[in-house]
């Protein structure tokens, strides 16, 4: 429900282990919220975190928005949070997300076979990692 979603976002924004950012299309007349990107599950000892994103409407897919968003949070993770490494998991079928991470210099690190359910079928989760250079 919308109430639970608002509560989730408020709690997330209070956390020092998760940072949620909105992705917007900005025109002269309005801002359109099209998705979110998160730096989450931050481990300050190991200086690592997971990056996850969602662009909801398909008309905004394949326009480079995810690639730009991943690049922005990469800079935040390195320069503001002092993280050493980011990682992200993509469903095997989500080729566009995989390409967006690869364009940002993430490297394929592993596959968890039959890890998740997508469209009522088991599928693989492919993991990508990026060491943030000094």
Predicted regions and their residues:
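Conserved GNAT-fold acetyl-CoA-binding loop/helix
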Residues: 1-10
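A short helix-loop-beta-strand connector motif used in the catalytic cores of GNAT acetyltransferases and
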Residues: 9-24
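Acyl-donor (CoA/ACP) binding surface of acyl/acetyltransferases
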Residues: 20, 27-134
């Amino acid at each position: 429900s919308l109430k639970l979603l608002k509560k989730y976002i408020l709690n997330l924004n209070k956390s020092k282990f998760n940072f949620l950012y909105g992705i917007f299309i900005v025109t002269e007349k309005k801002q359109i919220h099209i998705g979110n990107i998160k730096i989450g599950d931050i481990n300050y000892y190991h200086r690592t975190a997971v990056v996850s994103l969602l662009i909801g409407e398909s008309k905004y897919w394949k326009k480079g928005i995810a690639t730009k968003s991943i690049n922005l949070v990469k800079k935040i993770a390195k320069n503001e949070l002092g993280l050493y490494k980011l990682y992200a998991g993509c469903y095997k079928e989500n080729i566009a997300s995989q390409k967006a991470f690869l364009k940002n210099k993430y490297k394929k690190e592993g596959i968890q076979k039959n890890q998740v359910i997508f469209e009522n079928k088991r599928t693989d989760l492919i993991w990508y990692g990026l060491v943030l250079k000094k």
